[in-house]
Structures are given as C-alpha cells and as structure tokens.
UniProtKB/Swiss-Prot annotation:
The gene is aroB. PANTHER family: 3-DEHYDROQUINATE SYNTHASE, 3-DEHYDROQUINATE SYNTHASE, CHLOROPLASTIC. It comes from the Bacteria. Zn(2+) binds at residues 184, 247, 263. Binds 1 divalent metal cation per subunit. Can use either Co(2+) or Zn(2+). It catalyses: 7-phospho-2-dehydro-3-deoxy-D-arabino-heptonate = 3-dehydroquinate + phosphate. The lineage of its organism: Bacteria, Bacillati, Actinomycetota, Actinomycetes, Micrococcales. NCBIfam families: aroB (TIGR01357). This is 3-dehydroquinate synthase.
C-alpha cells in the first residue's frame, strides 16, 4: 500500500484533475478554492458520519451545509433534485458557492446535475466513495437523473473542478458493492487495456483487495482510459461512445428490474450480450466471448438473464438515449481493445444474442 498521490488530467475545454490517493477526502479545500463561501455536501444516509467529518475539516474556511439524499438510484429523481434546488435557494447560494458530491455514482450524478442547473452552473467537486463512482460515474462530467421512461434521460454534460478519489473509503465498502464496480473496470480492459484483464486473471483476490498494489493499478488504468476518452470527446460525439460497451442492454435491464439490480450486475450481463452480438456478427472469437464469462464469473458478477423478457428489454433499448433516430447502436468488439459501432443490427441478430445469455 502506498501513500503517494496520483493526478490524472482530464483535458478539453474545461480541464480538471482526477486525484487518487489515501486520506484525500480531508483535502477538498484545495479544490474548492478560496473564492467559495458556501459548500453544499450531498451524501447518502450511510455516509452521515463521513459527511460530518468532512464538514469539520472545511468549517474553518466555508459555511458547510450537509444534505442527505436517498441511496442508490432512488436519489436520481426529479423530486430529489428539486429538494436540492430548494436547499440552495433557501441558503442564498450564488455562483461563487460550491456543491460536493460525496457518495456513489448515483449521488455524484445527482450532485453534478444540481450544480450544473443551479444558476446555470456553480462550482462542483466530486468525492466518489465507491469503485463505480471512482472509475466511471464521477469522472466523465455526465450528470443526470432518471425518469419513468428510462435511465439518465434528463441531464447535462458538466465538468467538475476536480474529482477526488480517496481509496481509504473503499476499505470499508461492502464486498458486493465493490465487486459490482468491477464491471466497469472489466469494461475498460475489454475496450482498451488488456493489462487490466491480465491482472484480474492472474490473481483475482489481489486485484479486488482495496489495499493492494494490484487494485490501485487497475483503478489508475481505468481512470486513465476514461480521462483520455472524455478529454478527446466530452459530449459523446464520437470516441466516447466506446465507453457504452455493455450499457445498451445493461440500462434496459436496470429499467426492466425497476433499478433493483446493481448497475454493475446489469452491465456485466450487457457485456456478455455485446460479446455474443460481436460473435454472431462474425467479429469476435468464441474464446474472447468465453473470456468475458470467465472473468465476470470470477468476480461473482452475473453473465445471464432470465428467458422471456426480450420484448420488455427491446422496448427499453429503443428509448435509449444512445439510439440515433430509430437505429439502435451497440458497441461491439473486433477483438480485445478493438471496439467498434454496430449500428442498426437486425432484430433477429439481437434476439439470437439474447438467447445466448438467457437462463
């Protein structure tokens, strides 16, 4: 275990650092800056004590307001966003104030959306406390909430001032929550960095130990890939689309299951579906498809979905924000680290891929 701090820059029109290390949640003032007066810390119920510690560390410099929101996807509702707007309005929040998202991906999505929309944008610092938040949700500048029609349909691209990843927060994270976050880590391995897959295959226990060098390595590799892609294509006009590997079906599963499935579990199944889609379209080898199943299963992530739900999933995918007009778009692989877009595949091909993952 190292105490060194790593800083990865997300380039672009509004560049920002992603800082990785230990004990960093007590160093947020450096990223909030001296011009800020009030700080709204948005956190879930499970992080009340951590939020109070954060308030104590900031109290000498800022007026700190702690606001508890529901856990997980229940936070990403218009009613909760409206609640945050009311809090900021009652506190006379101005453009010289700031929002901190302290929590998992759903909380940072919500906090980012509130910051992006209040007065058309106030300063935002993200402090993700889950693996999913660190390697994915908090890093890319996507913010948003869900609607009855689907996931993340209302939101904004909004760059934070910084993303602060305190690895110490992962030590006490529940095992299932940690492993669910590994779905996104595995995604990076398949679309861009085979070293991630090699580390997991070599020693899955070390790779998933938050205090190990192997764990830190896969986290830094994952964030580095996300930062590079987002820096080149912040608003998802081209390259960034590769980050959606496994997400078209994955988001449909989340919607079909009323968000009772963990995001990582849904994305794991979505990646196996995308791999089968690649194989059935003549792009990906049988061995590469089975490698998906083997690695995900080693992380106790699901690789199949119940039979008989296809029409529900198809309807959800057709409402997906990644679709272009009436055409569904899937990221598939020609090989490991060779992603490409499969646009408008025939529904018979999609159903055949679904049958391969149906249990």
């Amino acid at each position: 275990m190292t105490d060194e701090t790593t800083e990865i820059l997300v380039a672009g029109a509004n560049p920002y650092p992603v800082v990785i290390g230990r004990g960093l949640r007590f160093d947020l003032a450096r990223h909030l800056g001296s011009a800020v007066s009030k700080v709204l810390v948005v956190h879930p119920p499970t992080l009340g004590a951590a939020a109070a510690e954060l308030r104590e560390s900031l109290a000498g410099q800022y007026e700190v307001l702690l606001t508890e929101v529901p856990d997980a996807e229940a936070a990403k509702r218009i009613e909760v966003a409206s609640f945050l707007w009311c809090i900021m309005g009652q506190a006379d929040f101005t453009r010289s104030d700031a929002v901190v998202g302290l929590g998992g991906g759903a909380v940072t999505d919500l906090a980012g959306f509130a910051a992006a929309t209040w007065l058309r944008g106030v300063r935002l610092v993200q402090a993700p406390t889950t693996l999913l938040g660190m390697v994915d949700a908090a890093v890319g500048g996507k913010t948003g909430i869900n609607t009855a029609e689907g996931k993340n349909l209302v939101g904004a691209f909004y760059a934070p001032a910084a993303v602060v990843c305190d690895l110490d927060m992962l030590i006490s994270l529940g095992r299932n929550e940690l492993l669910a976050g590994f779905a996104e880590v595995v995604k990076y391995g398949f679309i861009a960095e085979p070293e991630i897959l090699d580390i997991i295959e070599r020693d899955v226990d070390a790779a998933t130990d938050p205090e190990s060098a192997e764990f830190r390595r896969v986290v830094e590799l994952s964030i580095g890939i996300k930062a590079r892609v987002v820096g080149e294509d912040f608003t998802e006009q081209g390259l960034r689309e590769i980050l959606n590997y496994g997400h078209t079906l994955g988001h449909a599963i989340e919607h079909a299951e009323r968000y009772q499935w963990r995001h990582g579990a849904a994305i794991a199944v979505g990646m196996v579906f995308a791999a089968e889609l690649g194989r059935l379209s003549g792009r990906l080898s049988d061995d590469a498809v089975e490698r998906h199943r083997r690695i995900l299963a080693s992380l106790t992530l699901p690789t199949s979905y119940p039979l008989g739900r296809w029409q529900t999933l198809l309807a959800a995918m057709q409402r997906d924000k990644k679709a272009r007009g009436s055409l569904l778009r899937f990221i598939v692989l020609d090989d490991v680290a060779r992603p490409t877009v499969l646009a408008g595949p025939d529904q018979s091909l999609l159903f055949a891929a679904y049958q391969e993952i149906a249990s």
